[in-house]
């Protein structure tokens, strides 16, 4: 029997819905942001020191509509004010840790997971490149984008919108050919799959765009439009089909068959751990699963690190490369394909606590919105390494710690408390004394003369073993009661002090 304590619902249900929500967040934010810009021209550039890219005029009624930032309800005006405070802070967020080179690798991984590289036709064949990335708004996501904008020479713009889930979303955008070639391309050299090929295609689109200015070559025009429609790898999802677009431009769709077949190689550079960490920031989870083994009344602690992507062919290459990189770092990693997803997984105490967490600790300043889950697992790691999870008080502390967070659960806390009581009964029944960590002291003729509290050597306790002799305590029962009281005090004080 399994229970997931740090995630809502079943694992498969969560993964699918997280994937759907992320996709919808990106889609809605993209549409709302650029529709707002075109219709209201309400963008204020992030290059203005005092203001940021705001999606609605300040006097718009939407400014008072409330949405969620985490679990807190805020108005759009309040969210914008919070963002401006962070952006214009006297202690800039881009000085909070890690070198610029390290952050660049992190940002490449994040853009691989969450970024969009494409554009729009402004009119006719006048194609305009747009590179965007979105996240649910939080202080941490705002800090990330502010630092990214600084790294990109403050060339980007920001927007804050309310999505259909009632949550605020922050979007970051770079636009225009000059910015694309002078800022985006030099910085994002570590992309893969469709995003890597999109950069190559945009180079070709730009060349065709200039060529078409000099000639009325219909084949070049068809080539340009077909490249635009292939940028994301999801051309079938466009509302206006490729053929319809060509017809609207007075071009014959039959010319598509005459285009030369061109294949684009993928990025051959091996992704770094920081790239994977950035990808994890966009599409990963770090969480804790508790399993209850009914047969022997045992609580099993299972930490997990996951990155999930749709099972589109374009995602296969990078998921395989990231899996290879982690395995090369002696972090045992699996990659599974389902009907809808690829899932990269690092699982178990040894793989997560002993192999992955030490690397994450080196870059904890780059964890942004994942800091809460990381800190929880670091706490659990300390408990496990000390042996505290093999004690009644340690298990109680573990469940209390997990349920102290605001995440919803489908198993009541009381269920786990009852299971811990069952664990205590079984663990105690294994000793002839009927108490765990308490052992009988026998005379030479095998009569009980007392009890000894003796803790396993794996417990990181100060020297605490102690004997309780029956003659000193006026009988076996009183000596055993004193031993139990001593054991519980030592263990509870140890857990309370350290955890």
PLM features: residue spans?
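Internal intein/HINT superfamily modules and their associated LAGLIDADG
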Residues: 1-450, 456-460, 465, 470-473, ...
């Amino acid at each position: 029997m399994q229970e997931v304590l740090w995630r809502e619902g079943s694992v498969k249900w969560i993964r699918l819905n997280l994937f759907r929500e992320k996709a919808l967040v990106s889609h809605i934010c993209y549409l709302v942001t650029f529709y707002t810009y075109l219709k209201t021209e309400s963008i204020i550039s992030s290059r203005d020191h005092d203001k940021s890219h705001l999606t609605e005029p300040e006097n718009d009624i939407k400014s008072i509509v409330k949405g969620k930032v985490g679990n807190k309800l805020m108005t759009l005006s309040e969210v914008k004010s919070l963002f401006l405070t962070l952006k214009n802070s006297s202690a800039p967020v881009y000085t909070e840790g890690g070198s610029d080179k390290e952050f660049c690798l992190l940002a490449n991984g994040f853009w691989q997971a969450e970024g969009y590289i494409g554009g729009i036709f402004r009119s006719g064949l006048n194609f305009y490149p747009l590179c965007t990335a979105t996240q649910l708004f939080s202080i941490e996501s705002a800090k990330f984008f502010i630092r990214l904008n600084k790294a990109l020479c403050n060339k980007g713009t920001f927007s804050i919108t309310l999505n259909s889930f009632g949550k605020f979303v922050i979007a970051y955008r770079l636009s225009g050919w000059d910015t694309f070639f002078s800022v985006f391309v030099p910085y994002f050299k570590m992309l893969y799959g469709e995003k890597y090929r999109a950069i190559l295609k945009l180079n070709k689109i730009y060349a065709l765009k200039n060529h078409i200015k000099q000639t009325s070559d219909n084949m070049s025009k068809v080539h340009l439009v077909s490249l635009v429609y292939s940028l994301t790898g999801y051309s079938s999802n466009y509302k206006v089909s490729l053929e319809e677009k060509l017809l609207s431009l007075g071009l014959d769709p039959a010319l598509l068959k005459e285009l030369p077949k061109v294949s684009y190689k993928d990025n051959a550079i091996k992704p770094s751990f920081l790239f994977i960490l950035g990808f994890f920031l966009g599409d990963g989870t770090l969480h804790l699963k508790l399993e209850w083994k009914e047969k022997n009344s045992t609580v099993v602690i299972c930490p997990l690190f996951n990155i999930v992507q749709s099972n589109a062919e374009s995602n296969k290459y990078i998921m395989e490369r990231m899996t290879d990189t982690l395995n090369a770092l002696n972090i045992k990693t699996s990659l599974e394909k389902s009907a809808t997803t690829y899932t990269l997984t690092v699982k178990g105490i040894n793989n997560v606590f002993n192999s992955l967490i030490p690397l994450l600790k080196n870059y904890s300043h780059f964890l942004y919105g994942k800091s809460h889950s990381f800190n929880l697992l670091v706490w659990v790691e300390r408990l496990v390494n000390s042996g505290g999870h093999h004690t009644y008080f340690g298990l109680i502390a573990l469940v209390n710690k997990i349920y102290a967070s605001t995440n919803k659960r489908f198993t009541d806390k009381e269920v786990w408390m009852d299971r811990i009581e069952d664990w205590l009964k079984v663990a105690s029944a294994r000793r002839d004394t009927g108490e765990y960590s308490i052992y009988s002291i026998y005379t030479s003729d095998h009569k009980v003369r007392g009890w000894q509290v003796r803790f396993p050597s794996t417990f990181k306790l100060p020297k605490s073993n102690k004997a309780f002799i029956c003659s000193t305590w006026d009988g076996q029962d009183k000596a055993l009661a004193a031993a139990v009281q001593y054991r519980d005090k030592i263990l509870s004080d140890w857990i309370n002090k350290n955890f």
